[in-house]
């Protein structure tokens, strides 16, 4: 049981709205797409957080995927306490920085590779794009509709392209707008990707992609799609940039790279990498990373890059991921949680899709699992809102958007997973058959 009894004043969301735009410091936290008042967290432990009204929630948001070990893991807390006594940020290279980078490259089996630490996934993807443009001396970046790579102007928006408009794409390079240099294509559509690269390949600096999409809900890749990205980049001399901010160290220790046997030019890590503190990294062969200053001529800098405290917590978090049986334990939790929900959906014939890869999952109110953003956004928003309110009112906190991912952590107990599972099942039953209720 968590305790906030020492709190003298119950801070409310209304107060947050007086000091933050929309009451939050990142938009989705406002819960506007699900119609509930956002909880204000007072403390968290394991798989539970407590809000300022004393309500306990089983947490499946997990710091948006950063907390694979749950909240306040003793070894991570100890790393913070021990490290903070030596300082928090030096603005200089630290011993911990070097040790952590060396351990990462070794454990990820990346020979002849280097790392550049930054403080956020946005910084990492922004730097990767700058590298791609600087190395190739080209301007165009390709991403995929529904894919999220941070909030830098260079990777937001873009052109939604179909085969009919390919002939007009060459005009893009003459328009001096960041978005005009970004082409957004449908995810999982190799045919359109091939057409665009045939037309513009020699002008494409790089292709950035999520191996498993996590910001249109969980959308899994078709077997050949990721291979096509890598092959086309090699063929046209473009850089392949794989964004594993969400999937890295989560779907497997070596991430989606291991699952799909991929060798991108640059890989982006974040979230789990920092152990709950702000840290991210771009990793690539030294022939690529050495283009960054001061070794090369491409600029990137950051006051907090590789800061001492985040390096120590990240080091502790990744070591925990390497502990014997860690991913086997996660697999057991996955099976315990997913299987009964999937069986209930099948047996009841609900038009709902539970999509999951490892400890990442999403519920779509659609007959079949989406394969791209257009299909994902066809999920029944009204039913999702009703569903979300039901689970929220019963102490289960899912990511507050139909197009966000949810996460299981190693801290989730079987008891809490079973409880959450029953709440999810009964919420679905309540929505589709109001006469059939087992737990409400």
Swiss-Prot record:
Pathway: Porphyrin-containing compound metabolism; protoporphyrin-IX biosynthesis; 5-aminolevulinate from L-glutamyl-tRNA(Glu): step 2/2. Its cofactor is pyridoxal 5'-phosphate. The modification N6-(pyridoxal phosphate)lysine is found at residue 271. Its EC number is 5.4.3.8. GO terms for cellular component: cytoplasm. It is found in: Cytoplasm. InterPro entries: 4pyrrol_synth_GluAld_NH2Trfase (IPR004639), Aminotrans_3 (IPR005814), Aminotrans_3_PPA_site (IPR049704), PyrdxlP-dep_Trfase (IPR015424), PyrdxlP-dep_Trfase_major (IPR015421), PyrdxlP-dep_Trfase_small (IPR015422). GO terms for molecular function: glutamate-1-semialdehyde 2,1-aminomutase activity; pyridoxal phosphate binding; transaminase activity. This is Glutamate-1-semialdehyde 2,1-aminomutase. It comes from Chlamydia pneumoniae.
């Amino acid at each position: 049981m968590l305790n906030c009894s020492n709190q003298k004043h119950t801070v409310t969301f209304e107060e947050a709205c007086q000091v933050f735009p929309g009451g939050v410091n990142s938009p989705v936290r406002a819960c506007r797409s699900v119609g509930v008042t956002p909880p204000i967290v007072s403390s968290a432990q394991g798989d539970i957080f407590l809000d300022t009204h004393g309500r306990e929630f089983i947490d499946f948001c997990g710091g948006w995927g950063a907390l694979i070990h749950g909240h306040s893991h003793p070894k991570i807390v100890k790393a913070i306490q021990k490290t903070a006594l030596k300082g928090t940020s030096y603005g200089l290279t630290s011993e911990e920085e070097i040790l952590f980078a060396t351990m990462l490259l070794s454990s990820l089996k990346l020979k002849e590779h280097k790392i550049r630490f930054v403080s956020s996934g946005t910084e990492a993807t922004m730097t990767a794009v700058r590298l791609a443009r600087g190395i190739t001396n080209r301007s165009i970046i390709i991403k995929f509709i529904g894919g999220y790579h941070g909030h830098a102007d260079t990777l937001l928006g873009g052109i939604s392209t179909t085969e009919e408009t390919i002939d007009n794409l060459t005009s893009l390079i003459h328009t001096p707008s960041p978005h005009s240099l970004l082409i957004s294509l449908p995810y999982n559509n190799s045919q359109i990707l091939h057409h665009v690269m045939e037309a513009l390949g020699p002008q494409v600096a790089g292709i950035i992609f999520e191996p498993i999409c996590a910001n249109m809900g969980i959308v899994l890749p078709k077997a050949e799609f990721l291979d096509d990205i890598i092959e086309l980049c090699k063929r046209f001399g473009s850089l392949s940039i794989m964004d594993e901010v969400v999937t890295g160290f989560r779907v497997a220790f070596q991430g989606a790279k291991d699952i799909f046997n991929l060798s991108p030019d640059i890989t982006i890590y974040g979230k789990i990498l920092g152990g709950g503190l702000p840290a991210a990294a771009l990793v690539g062969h030294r022939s690529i990373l050495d283009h960054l200053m001061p070794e090369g001529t491409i600029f990137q800098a950051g006051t907090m890059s590789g800061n001492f405290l985040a390096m120590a917590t990240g080091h502790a978090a990744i070591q925990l991921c390497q502990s014997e049986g860690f991913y086997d334990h996660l697999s057991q939790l996955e099976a315990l949680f997913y299987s009964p929900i999937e069986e209930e959906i099948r047996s009841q014939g609900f038009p709902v899709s539970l999509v999951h890869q490892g400890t990442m999952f999403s519920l779509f109110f659609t007959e079949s699992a989406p394969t791209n953003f257009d299909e994902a956004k066809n999920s029944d928003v009204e039913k999702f809102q009703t569903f979300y309110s039901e689970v929220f009112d019963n102490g289960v906190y899912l990511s507050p958007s139909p197009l966000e991912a949810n996460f299981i952590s190693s801290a989730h107990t079987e008891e809490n997973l079973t409880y959450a599972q029953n709440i999810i099942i009964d919420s679905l039953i309540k929505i589709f058959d109001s006469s059939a209720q087992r737990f409400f």
